[in-house]
Amino acid sequence: MRRIVLLVWVMVAAASSSLWGAEQQDSPVGKPAGSGVIVHSDGYVLTAEHVIANAKWIFVMTAEEFRAPAILVSTDSEHDLALLKIETVGLTEAPIGYAGAVRLDQKIITAGFSFGLREVSVTRGRIAAVRTRGVQRVFQVDAAINPGNSGGPIFNGRGEVVGVMTSKFSHPSGIVPEGMSFAGPISYATPLLAKKCRNKSRLTRYTSQIERMNLAIY
């Protein structure tokens, strides 16, 4: 799929001392946390909220080794979504599709950085079910989803983002069924995408602070 350049690898460094390198006490060590998708050329990235939960530092990297620190613009805990901002322009943004047109048994493509590996993983599958959780609508997909795919997009046949990977199903017995993962419709991200990062100085200060450190990748 030629649009994998739209993806980013989301890494975090938490406040916990266990994430700090033994030989670099003043440098946060980035832990692979999940995936994301570029939704605006000015540096806006959409991911899952649980990917960046409790993070002290957030930074992203593409498969082409472009790396940048990010700030959290806004979150939607109800739908497990988060919008990040990096200080750059001219990025290639993902085309956004119409989630309302997604139907049962529709072919989809998922993409992300499985297991925190730097190579993009692309899998094909179908919409196994369109379910509701309370008043929410979620897509059940049968594509292979692994740790690290959370926050990554699902594409329709036209290469448009129609959903964001959020979770795998876990049965109360502890059994994790194969081929049973969920994605939130991209339409739930509309309120987040409508917001802008107005505090430019905050991003500039944050970026400068990280650049003064020797930020390591785990």
Task: Describe each PLM feature range.
Residues 33, 40-120, 135-139, 147, ...:
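Conserved active-site neighborhood of the chymotrypsin/trypsin-like protease fold
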Residues 121-132:
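Short, compositionally biased
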Residues 36, 58, 68-71, 125, ...:
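Small-residue-enriched segments and motifs
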Residues 7-18:
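Bacterial N-terminal signal peptides
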Residues 1-4:
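Positively charged n-region of N-terminal signal peptides that target proteins for export
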Residues 21-29, 55, 70, 93, ...:
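C-terminal cap/linker of serine protease catalytic domains
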Residues 37-38, 144-165:
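Catalytic nucleophile loop of clan PA
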Residues 104, 122, 140, 160, ...:
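Extracytoplasmic/secreted proteins, especially bacterial periplasmic and envelope-associated proteins
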